[in-house]
Amino acid sequence: MISVNKVFYAHSERFQMQNMNVHIKAGEVVSLIGPNGSGKSTLLRLMARLLKQSEGDIVLDGKSIHTMKSADVAKQLAMLPQMHDHQLDLTVKELIEFGRGPHKSWRGRLNKEDEEIVDWALSVTNLEGYEYRLLQSLSGGERQRAWIAMTLAQRTNVLLLDEPTTFLDIVHQLEVMELVKRLNEEFGMTIIMVLHDINQAAQYSDRLLVLKRGKLQYDGVPEEVLCHEMFQHIFGIEVDIFQGSEKPFFTPKRISKKGGAKCEQKNVLPLS
């Protein structure tokens, strides 16, 4: 579906991404985790063609992404960046209609199919009845769902989300994560997201990619990646790891001075 092949990228002397190799399969939910400045958002922006690597290639559905027309990329891949303008003088429906941009005719008007897709995006994100509300009048969670609805209106197979739960309270975080789960399970969307909440990443993802200083350090299912060595190596903390009903989760204990190593076994504590 989307592959990052031997990519090199540097935006300053202090940060370099070297020989990055990632392959995302169709239908996967993949979360990028790691400390601040590790390259998570940079990797996502490279995949979205918002940044251009100096070496290597990024392939979307068999085609080099930098040889494709922008409109063709936008028909296959949508990205919601971390920050958006919440003060736009737009209604929810007007915002969502922007998602139809890559599909519009040269006249720029919405046809019947466009209107049906906008209505579908409103329905999927539980925003029916909000279409004529101004963005400024919405709660944080409602606004985030409106922006996600705009990306859904592109009708792509791949959705990139950069910290979609940042600045939201726990209820609205769970609303967004449950929406991500539904988009994957009901509509088969491939979803790649940057998350700071590692427990949420483990709960809602098929795979975790762990970055540090521009390098991919761990790549695997949550049960394998969430181990004591990873937390020591990547975050410099000691943790307790528990096995939930489906996925593992952790609680932090203290800052660690140990270096960490590879996760060679499942260091999981049973729930009492």
Swiss-Prot record:
Q: What class of enzyme is it?
A: translocase
Q: Where does ATP bind?
A: 34-41
Q: How does it sit in the membrane?
A: Peripheral membrane protein
The family database entries (SUPFAM superfamilies) matched by this protein are listed as: P-loop containing nucleoside triphosphate hydrolases
In this record, what's one Pfam family? ABC_tran
Q: Which GO terms describe its biological process?
A: iron ion transport
Instruction: Name the phenotypic consequences of knocking out this gene.
Output: A mutant lacking fatE, fpuC and fpuD ATPases is deficient in petrobactin import in iron-depleted conditions.
Q: Which InterPro entries match?
A: AAA+_ATPase, ABC_transporter-like_ATP-bd, ABC_transporter-like_CS, P-loop_NTPase, Siderophore_ABC-ATPase
Q: Which family does the record assign?
A: Belongs to the ABC transporter superfamily.
State the protein's name.
Petrobactin import ATP-binding protein FpuC
Q: Which organism is it from?
A: Bacillus anthracis
Which gene holds the coding sequence for this protein? Answer: fpuC
